[in-house]
């Protein structure tokens, strides 16, 4: 634990990064030890009360084993899960948290250089340094716009297609179901790379095949080549449309299952009361969908907030740059990737941005879950 405080004192011999990682592990071990210590004290206190009250307690080893098997068997089953969660989630989070408060960058790479604790410097640099301030503001604003627009689009398309497919007059529902599931069936990275070629400015199918068809009805498109991959605005439009295509099948399947579970009596009563299609949707269909699927719908926004693959595979975060190593279409998670790769990595700055992302996503998700009563199923 002492090495966690100093992070070494001799370059070349002391690897500050390894010391930090070992210190994080020791910290977890100490916390677990303290928890077990107080749990033993509580158990001893409970046992003493039982003895004083004449309640039988386990005194022999055989009785203790029997008591653990009968009363503690569920805890024995979940211990492996807690151990896995500790090393797969909690441990990396603690290491990331610690790195955010160091000067770990390309100028301080262990073991040749030592790391130092720098406090809140990385967080203040995001606001004080003009390059990072401008990049962070631009990337954060686009990340929010992207998450809201793309998620809302895929949810709207998914609900709309599910409602259409669930209508009794629709024939060949299985065929429509297969068609709607095609974007989900094909691996996302293949679809993204295919769209990347289709949106090519000069030879892509969108500009050379699709737009000429619409030009017959929209004269201003005649002969126009939209710069899908060379203009940041049009690239963002293409990204949002692509995510709508990639994400709606999941919402479609989820919504279709909910629609088929809604009793027809509700719609019949609404019909008798003179409700039109919009009133039925607003007062029956949508509330039922929201009551059941609210956690999943919220998770679509949090997923797209950190949707790295589409940004990286489509155009590498380009075109152009907004400073601070961020591309014009980078979201926060892809900006973090840029900060940790290349010839001048900024690991501590990336860790600081990661913590900011976590705080934003967790806060918004918790507020949304609470406002929508996402886990209150009593009234459904």
Which residues make up each language-model segment?
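A structural signal for multi-pass alpha-helical bundles of membrane permease subunits
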Residues: 1-2, 10-30, 37-50, 73-380
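Membrane-interfacial, low-structure loops and terminal tails that flank and connect transmembrane helices
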Residues: 50-69
């Amino acid at each position: 634990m002492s090495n966690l405080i100093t992070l070494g004192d001799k370059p070349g011999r002391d690897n500050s990064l390894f010391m930090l990682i070992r210190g994080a592990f020791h910290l977890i071990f100490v916390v677990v030890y303290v928890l077990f210590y107080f749990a033993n004290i509580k158990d001893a206190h409970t046992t003493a009360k039982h003895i004083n009250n004449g309640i039988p307690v386990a005194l022999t080893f055989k009785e203790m084993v029997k008591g653990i098997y009968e009363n503690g068997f569920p805890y024995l089953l979940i211990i492996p899960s807690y151990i896995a969660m500790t090393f797969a989630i909690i441990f990396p989070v603690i290491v990331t948290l610690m790195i955010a408060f160091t000067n770990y960058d390309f100028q301080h790479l262990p073991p040749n250089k030592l790391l130092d604790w720098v406090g809140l410097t990385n967080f203040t640099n995001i606001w004080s340094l003009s390059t990072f301030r401008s990049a962070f503001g631009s990337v954060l604003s686009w990340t929010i716009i992207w998450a809201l627009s793309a998620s809302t689009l895929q949810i709207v398309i998914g609900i709309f297609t599910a409602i259409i497919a669930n209508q009794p007059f629709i024939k060949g529902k299985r065929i429509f179901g297969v068609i709607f599931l095609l974007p989900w069936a094909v691996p996302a990275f293949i679809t993204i790379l295919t769209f990347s070629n289709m949106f090519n400015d000069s030879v892509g199918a969108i500009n050379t095949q699709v737009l000429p068809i619409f030009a017959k009805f929209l004269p201003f498109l005649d002969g126009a080549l939209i710069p899908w991959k060379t203009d940041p605005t049009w690239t963002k439009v293409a990204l949002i449309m692509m995510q709508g295509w990639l994400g709606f099948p999941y919402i479609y399947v989820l919504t279709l299952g909910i629609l088929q579970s809604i009793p027809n009596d509700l719609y019949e009563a609404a019909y008798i009361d003179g409700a039109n299609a919009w009133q039925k949707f607003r007062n029956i269909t949508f509330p039922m969908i929201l009551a059941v699927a609210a956690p999943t719908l919220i998770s679509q926004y949090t997923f797209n907030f950190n949707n790295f693959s589409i940004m990286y595979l489509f155009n590498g975060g380009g075109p152009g740059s907004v400073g601070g190593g961020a591309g014009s279409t980078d979201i926060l998670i892809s900006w973090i990737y840029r900060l940790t790769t290349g010839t001048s990595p900024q690991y501590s700055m990336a860790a600081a941005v990661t913590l900011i992302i976590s705080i934003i996503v967790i806060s918004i998700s918790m507020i949304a879950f609470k406002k929508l009563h996402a886990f209150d199923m009593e009234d459904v």
